[in-house]
Amino acid sequence: NINFNAKGMISNNRFADTGAIGAAIAFDPTQPVMNGNSKYGGYFAWENAGEFISIATKNPVAMLQQKKEEANSKNLVGNIQVDYKFHFLPELRANLNLGMDMATGTQDIYYPKESPLGYVDNGKTGYETIDKYNHLLDFYLQYAKDFNEKHHFDIMAGYSWQHFHRSTENAYNNLNGDNPTSYIFKTESYLISFFGRVNYSFMNRYLITATLRNDGTSRFSKDNRWGLFPSVALGWKIKEEGFMKDVDAVSDLKLRLG
């Protein structure tokens, strides 16, 4: 059997200034929204002796109309799964799962020099890009067999590999040119696992499960990247015993110790 799934998305967004809500609540309702002052793009702004008061309540309409913040993103998620039963040994099957998650996006921010948040710095501009992709590979073999209608074995062993990558590039600048900031940030890591499991049941009543995992990640130091995790569990299906089968008040009863 082969299953394939894929989903993509492209989005374009424009973001308003969230501070406009608080500014609308605090703004003096007796003042006009527009007063023709060309210094602020025709919008009203508080002044003292002809100078802009940066700590005064901002004009909420100007905050919404004069800020430009747009973001564009592309996302793609997909996986393919192959499940194969061997003809020469029908109790044995192989399962392979390949997956990916990719995303890229850009964001632009611009405050003109006439805007309430850009006036002091002669305007502001910013740019950010984000690239992210994750890859996944899972593979395991599973063997299940019944013997004499009393013994059931289910044995599985596999390998898992994951890759995580993210990079961000960011730049902001006041248009007077005296305070530019930028940075590039990248992260990359891997997660690798080897795992196995053995299930045994006798007469579908008495159960034993043993598992073993060996996980390693590049996020830890070289001396501490790997961890071994064993576990054992015992089970007893009490409902399958003769003294419980005729007890209709109990639909299922199982004791498990691990």
Question: Where are the predicted features?
Answer:
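Flexible loop and strand-edge segments within Gram-negative outer membrane beta-barrel domains
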Residues: 1-56, 67-75, 116, 121-132, ...
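Outer-membrane beta-barrel transmembrane strands
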Residues: 4, 13-15, 55-109, 127-147, ...
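One face of beta-strands
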Residues: 4-6, 230-234
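Outer-membrane beta-barrel translocator domains and adjoining extracellular loop/strand segments
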Residues: 16-21, 107-114, 167-174, 221-226
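Extracytoplasmic loops and strand-loop junctions of Gram-negative outer membrane beta-barrel proteins
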Residues: 58-67, 119-126, 177-183, 214-216, ...
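Secondary-structure transition/capping motifs at alpha-helix termini
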Residues: 88, 146-150, 202-204, 235-250
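Signature of Gram-negative outer-membrane beta-barrel scaffolds
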Residues: 170, 175-231, 250
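Acidic/histidine-rich catalytic neighborhood
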Residues: 252-258
